[in-house]
């Protein structure tokens, strides 16, 4: 496996630290007036999500992490695992609740949504839902005429269980387009 020197450190680089895969979030090169130069690095542990700060002397190396990002289609959830399939090879992978994170509330069974899955040694570490999804509103308060002062919104429960704020004109059984990164309503579908 390749090694990265402190000169190669940049945000987004995936490295191994204490036998855990990490992603570099920030890298600051420091050259004090006296003494050896060093790098102050902020890393996110990809297994636990914890952020840690480490200092490396100039010239230190870290091993590259065996991380692969693949695009896969979502198939179904069997209660404890979410199942995905590679559209070319038809290979299937199952991700647990920790790997799914927030993506679980945006995916519905048989939707065939394309997700980006981060694999470490063939095991899913993280699943990113598509940026935009279309879901049906299953529960929301009716919009009453004249209820528009301030242009506010109302909460709406979607078919996956997620709750988003929608404009007052959105009714039950309508489909809405949602940005999964922010959890915000975009438009009626």
Curated annotation (Swiss-Prot):
SUPFAM superfamilies: Nucleic acid-binding proteins (SSF50249), Translation proteins SH3-like domain (SSF50104). May be beta-lysylated on the epsilon-amino group of Lys-34 by the combined action of EpmA and EpmB, and then hydroxylated on the C5 position of the same residue by EpmC (if this protein is present). Lysylation is critical for the stimulatory effect of EF-P on peptide-bond formation. The lysylation moiety may extend toward the peptidyltransferase center and stabilize the terminal 3-CCA end of the tRNA. Hydroxylation of the C5 position on Lys-34 may allow additional potential stabilizing hydrogen-bond interactions with the P-tRNA. InterPro entries: Elong-fact-P_C, NA-bd_OB-fold, Rib_uL2_dom2, Transl_elong_fac_P/YeiP, Transl_elong_KOW-like, Transl_elong_P/YeiP_cen, Transl_elongation_fac_P, Translation_prot_SH3-like_sf. GO terms for biological process: peptide biosynthetic process. Keywords: Cytoplasm, Elongation factor, Hydroxylation, Protein biosynthesis. The modification N6-(3,6-diaminohexanoyl)-5-hydroxylysine is found at residue 34. One of its GO terms (molecular function) is translation elongation factor activity. Its main location: cytoplasm. It is found in: Cytoplasm. Pathway: Protein biosynthesis; polypeptide chain elongation. One of its GO terms (cellular component) is cytoplasm. SMART domains: EFP, Elong-fact-P_C. PANTHER family: ELONGATION FACTOR P, ELONGATION FACTOR P (EF-P) FAMILY PROTEIN. Belongs to the elongation factor P family. Involved in peptide bond synthesis. Alleviates ribosome stalling that occurs when 3 or more consecutive Pro residues or the sequence PPG is present in a protein, possibly by augmenting the peptidyl transferase activity of the ribosome. Modification of Lys-34 is required for alleviation. This is Elongation factor P. The gene is efp.
């Amino acid at each position: 496996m390749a090694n990265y020197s402190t000169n190669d450190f940049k945000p987004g680089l995936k490295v191994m630290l204490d036998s855990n895969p990490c992603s570099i979030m920030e890298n600051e090169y420091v050259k004090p007036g006296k003494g050896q130069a060093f790098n102050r690095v902020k890393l996110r542990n990809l297994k636990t999500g914890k952020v840690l700060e480490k200092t490396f002397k100039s010239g230190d190396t870290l091993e590259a992490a065996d991380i692969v990002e693949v695009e896969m289609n979502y198939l179904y959830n069997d209660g404890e695992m979410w199942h995905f399939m590679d559209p070319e090879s038809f290979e299937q992978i199952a991700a647990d609740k920790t790997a799914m994170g927030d993506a679980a509330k945006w995916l519905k069974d048989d939707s065939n949504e394309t997700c980006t899955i981060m694999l470490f040694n063939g095991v899913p570490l993280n699943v990113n839902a598509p940026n935009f999804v279309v879901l049906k509103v299953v529960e929301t308060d009716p919009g009453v005429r004249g209820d528009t002062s301030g242009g506010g919104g109302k909460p709406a429960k979607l078919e996956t269980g997620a709750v988003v704020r929608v404009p007052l004109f959105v009714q039950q059984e309508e489909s809405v387009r949602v940005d999964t990164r922010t959890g915000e309503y975009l438009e009626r579908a």
